Amino acid sequence: FAADGNAAETSSESGTKWRADFRSDKPGKWNYIVSFVKEKQVAVELQLAGTPVSPFDGKRGSFMVAQAKQSPTGFLTEGRLQYVGKRCLQFTGSKQYFFKVGADSPETLLAYKDFDGTIARKKKVPLKTWGPHLQDWKSGDPAWQNGKGKGLIGALNYLAEQGVNSISFIPYNAGGDGDNVWPMISPDEKLHYDCSKLDQWQIVFDHAQAKGLFLHFKTQETENDDHKVGHPGNPGHAPAALDGGELGVERKLYYRELIARFGYQLALNWNLGEENTQTPRVQREMAAFIKELDPYDHHVVIHSYPDQQDKVYPPLLGDQSELTGASLQNHWDQAHRRTVQWIEASKKAGKMWVVCNDEQGPADGGVPPDPGYKGFSGKAKEKQREYDLHDIRKHTLWGTLMAGGAGVEYYFGYKLPENDLGCQDFRSREQSWKYGKIAVDFFKSFSRDVIIEEMRCHDDLVANTKHDNSRYCLAKPGKL
């Protein structure tokens, strides 16, 4: 439902317009048929046929899509990014494999004052202005309502210019750490979606894709996924949890709205949840519902607490679920070992997962800012030792890639400057972005050759059977 058809500009709350968004993954003639039906719960019960609404239901037509012009950035010339049963996602057009280096933080990316209906419910987590990136907005870039959106659009420009190719965000964090992002008109109206806000999000997501930024939808977080409380998962009550943690009307509608409004984008994944604590049954049901509903078959992953991976992932491997990958959270010096573990476990189960390192411990530190950024030393303290961006580069970035992982997203901790909830200046980690670009460019330079996909972690060839950080080996024995 699109309200008046121009809600991003008008902030309209009502209207008669319905819109289908589509982005083709190949040029040529495309045919369409309209399905427009009504029935109680027809939007959430996929087996309901519904009653046709005349004269719209059944209308047919066609249109031509021309070959996209070559562009130095963006996904429009690559085709759709898909899971192909291998350890990396692959573009349908270019056949290029995708290795990511992205920003996991801030998880409150969408907590932006320029979006309609967006408020801060915690004094310590105010809305963002993205002021430091106003300088990065360029003439011709999108905005809405007489110049709104320039800060966030500029932030995306900056990331793309640094070689970053992925952003992560939580579109529903009601009751969570940020408690300032939701697609509905309010957290208490779980079945009433905000058309103008979502159209403004769409402008941002469209620009991200045009700049070559993969969209990582972390659809919920541990504080609002179910009624279990905190890391131990003690019994409690979370009013913001959709259907109390089950797959019911609220959650099904949430997935449908996300897929209907944003699923046409070429490069994204759906993440069942950050530090997810729902049961294996519900996790399987959620993944299956998304798989059935999403016409583009986007990549589906799940994120877990580091010390709960051995509990969460095994019941989801192979044909036990529709998941196609894991979004790992590990201590920065455990990325290699844990990436190897889940790639090998998924292979053994009969369905290779795409495994990425998307959050780095310790929780208070993560990836530290650059040395000299606003006087910062560059060193993060952890118990009896210190670490810096070079440790992240060696053991998180290269440790993941040399394990056969498909890339990283960097988490900014909660104590350091420009942290996970408060970050508004991506220049705080500029050197880490540059190191990431070097690594991704290295793998992209020969990833059209199928041999890169055939390579596996072979630490045994360099006498590292424990997969520690002493040395790494990615190889196809006898070839490379």
PLM feature spans:
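Short, flexible/disordered intra-domain loops and linkers
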Residues: M184-I185, G230-A241, P368-L389, L421-D425
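Aromatic- and carboxylate-lined catalytic core of secreted/periplasmic carbohydrate-active enzymes
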Residues: V354-V355, P362-P369, A380-E382, L389-L480
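Generic beta-sheet signal
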Residues: K218, H303, D358, Y410-Y411
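Short beta-strand/loop segments at the ligand-binding rim of alpha/beta enzyme cores
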Residues: L293-V301, K351-E359, D364-V367
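Ligand-binding face of N-terminal immunoglobulin V-set domains in extracellular IgSF glycoproteins
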Residues: F1-V65
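Glycine-enriched alpha-helix->loop->beta-strand junction motifs that scaffold or abut catalytic
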Residues: Y296, G318-G325, A349-V354, A403-A406
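Active-site mouth of glycoside hydrolases
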Residues: E39-Q41, V53, R60, A68, ...
